[in-house]
């Protein structure tokens, strides 16, 4: 064990025992880890003596690095231990195993970049040496004998084009994909790319019609010169030659490599892209004017839909810029539109997306609701004050001095004698009879009797009094009393109807 533990000594051993096994952990490296690493190296048939130097640790890491992805946890632990030991040998200050691995990866990346730069320099030198004999204008290249030859489009490129059509159909991103895959292609290569499209034959027929129209325009603008063709010169291409239907591959190569060149491949490619634009427009029937942000749609998703539809629009770049500046703000939802208008017309797309981030979320809804409730409360209070329905706080009034702002028990004025309501002495205000009458003109509550809004007595049904024709009759005292009662209560008796009651006599 002593021989195995003698890998480090002195200051290196102190530095080794200060390194933690894990970031933020309590355990640190000890001599037992070196002993374990030596035994593992012997088990894997590696020389444990390599641990004594930094170069030896580097060799061990190169051997173990290829097995890290498929190796066991013991191999990974051994690699981490050797990497940490390498940092100790190289005097690289690290605090834990993860930091040591990061340092090792950084060193390896720098070494790899230097190797790549050296290889690139060698390739550039070789290309410069052979540039006089070989042309790299793919797919038309010049061989060592100085002849211009054609290299067909690779099956991988054709397969990528077919997958794009199958997955994307004719969405706007198909056009830049076609442009990238057909870079430098001849008309024959372009026709091959169009012929391998199995489905979407209606779209292919539309594309053929567009190509025929453009070929006819080319023939109209570039008429054939009269007379024979001078010897050594090639004939001028017609529209059908550019489309690759009446020209051979050698003629196409000759036009593209002549001096001055006639880029029949680029011209044909431009016609195809024009037809693809029409097809994309047909497969994307949604107009840019119909792209509107939903009430709960995030602004980022709305911008994605907007620009995806904008790519399918057949318009110049100036018109598309105007659509972006105008319609993007105009078709946003009310919340985002308020924010975008506050930014001003010169705001960039990044500023717009940053300002509208989070619009429609819970926090934004809560803030908008709070503002709306605050505005509603303020407007209601203003309306009540305008109508005169708003009553301020009722101020208290002192019954002693008659002033407002304090109660009678807190009044500093001399104590008023008697009732505080009528000013008379002998009773208090609670017993004062001079109170405000109710709507019937009665003082309520009364001490006796029924309430003022009830009848105080029930009248009995009566008849009119009988007429008296007693000439010179003597009136008895009882008759006088009855006559007096009749005068006071004319309806309180029925004697006028039934005469003298026998029971009452």
From Swiss-Prot:
Miscellaneous comment: HIV-1 lineages are divided in three main groups, M (for Major), O (for Outlier), and N (for New, or Non-M, Non-O). The vast majority of strains found worldwide belong to the group M. Group O seems to be endemic to and largely confined to Cameroon and neighboring countries in West Central Africa, where these viruses represent a small minority of HIV-1 strains. The group N is represented by a limited number of isolates from Cameroonian persons. The group M is further subdivided in 9 clades or subtypes (A to D, F to H, J and K).
GO cellular component: host cell nucleus; host cell plasma membrane; host multivesicular body; membrane; viral nucleocapsid; virion membrane
Gene: gag
Annotated region described as PPIA/CYPA-binding loop, given as residue ranges: 223-231
CCHC-type zinc finger span: 396-413, 417-434
Lipid positions (N-myristoyl glycine): 2
Region (Interaction with host AP3D1): 12-19
Keyword annotations: AIDS, Capsid protein, Host cell membrane, Host cytoplasm, Host endosome, Host membrane, Host nucleus, Host-virus interaction, Lipoprotein, Membrane, Metal-binding, Methylation, Myristate, Phosphoprotein, Repeat, RNA-binding, Viral budding, Viral budding via the host ESCRT complexes, Viral nucleoprotein, Viral release from host cell, Virion, Zinc, Zinc-finger
Region Disordered, annotated ranges: 448-486
Region spans: Interaction with membrane phosphatidylinositol 4,5-bisphosphate and RNA: 14-33
Motif (Nuclear localization signal): 26-32
Protein name: Gag polyprotein
One Gene Ontology term from the biological process aspect of the record: viral translational frameshifting
Family assignment from sequence similarity: Belongs to the primate lentivirus group gag polyprotein family.
Lineage: superkingdom: Viruses
Interaction with Gp41: region residues: 7-31
Annotated region (Interaction with host CALM1), positions in chain: 8-43
Annotated Basic and acidic residues bias: 473-486
Residue positions, PTM Asymmetric dimethylarginine: 415
Short sequence motif LYPX(n)L motif: positions: 488-497
Site (Cleavage): 138-139, 369-370, 384-385, 438-439, 454-455
